[in-house]
Amino acid sequence: MIKLIPEEALRIYRKVQSANFEVYFVGGCVRNMLLKKPVKDWDMTTNATPDALLKIFPKAFYDNKFGTVGVPVDKKIIEITTFRTEKGYSDKRRPDSVEWGKTIEEDLARRDFTINSIALKLDAKRSTLDAILIDPYQGQDDIKNKIIKAVGNPKARFKEDALRLLRAIRIATEFSFTIEEKTWKEILADASLINEVSGERIRIELLRILASEFAYEGVLLLKESNLLNYIVPELIEGIGISQKRPGRHHVDDVFTHNVLSLKFCPSTDPVIKFAALLHDVGKPKVMSKDEEGLVIFYNHEIAGANIARKICDRLKFSGKERDKIVNLIRWHMFTVDEKLSDAGIRRFIRRIGVENVKDMMDLRIGDRLGGGTQTAESWRLKLFKKRIENQLKPAPFSINDLAIDGNDIIKELKIKPGPKIGDILQKLFLEVDEDLSKNNKEYLLKRLQELSK
């Protein structure tokens, strides 16, 4: 296993070890090495106190009460945490008090799942033969059997940090593992504890689920665990809401369609996949029936965009991520019409934003396949995408793309800066948008004289 550890992490490890302290690689890095998966963070644990670690690493920093020291290495941070025991979790997130532990076994006892409670100790000779795994909870067996199991008492672990409820789902999703029966039953019983967790922490775990190859299965697991009822209850409202209409491809209820749209959305961006999952979230709110008694969802895209905005704010998405999700949902019902003019194509691009075109097409593919259509793209959609590509090359999508600007107007018409300049530019832009050949300086300067009369 030592061959899998990068040299910079080994240097840090050896420095602590050479100062006569115990030190171990621990947690996700050991788990992923055993799984032969990429390792992101090379976390360590030691019996050295934070003060002792700061003496070993003068450039390290320590600004928390949980014993974690950050050591900067090649633009990365390697975290080293002192052995600790924890008492009381009144906020279901952080321990009320922390005491330094004496042994690695004490430290491993406070961790969440058995597969994360394995420590790796290296001998001073850097020999792979003498690398020792400390595994008091048989985490290696659970890795082999693909099982997620809480360390010790599941109820105690989840009450210590309620995010572990969601983390169990996330790890099971990422590695396609099964959650052990006692652990699963406790998740079902304690699902409401997730309300104690901040939206930001929930969002991080949720996006990791959506980024997984098994995102579809992960969302279904969230539903089965009751966690989805508290994380995104708006999705649950779609259960049992029929969409069947004569001549329409929808055969599933709204919830199932949303989840299938996520499954078939070709984007690998978890933010776009979240938009696919939420794209019809407005349907339950606007559902009604027409004069024939058939179900309709008039303006569901508008209602859905408003609901998605609230969800994103609750989960502390960045403004940029939220606006993208809302935009995609608001306009996902765009019509693919082969008779649409080039100017109409350009208006569509401006409406959704050039940066959102590919994401909108991915959402449409997910929507189609998630609704039971057998082909990802109709001939109309393929033609529409081709026409969009053609218009993205030469088209002026804003006033700034015109062949003249405000300075040209001031110079040509000999007027002072003011609102009139913006009005003139807008008129010129609308004219050019209908006929791109007019976007040349000679023509536009001539039109200036006509517009100023």
Language model regions located:
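Catalytic cores of the polymerase beta-like nucleotidyltransferase superfamily
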Residues: 1-453
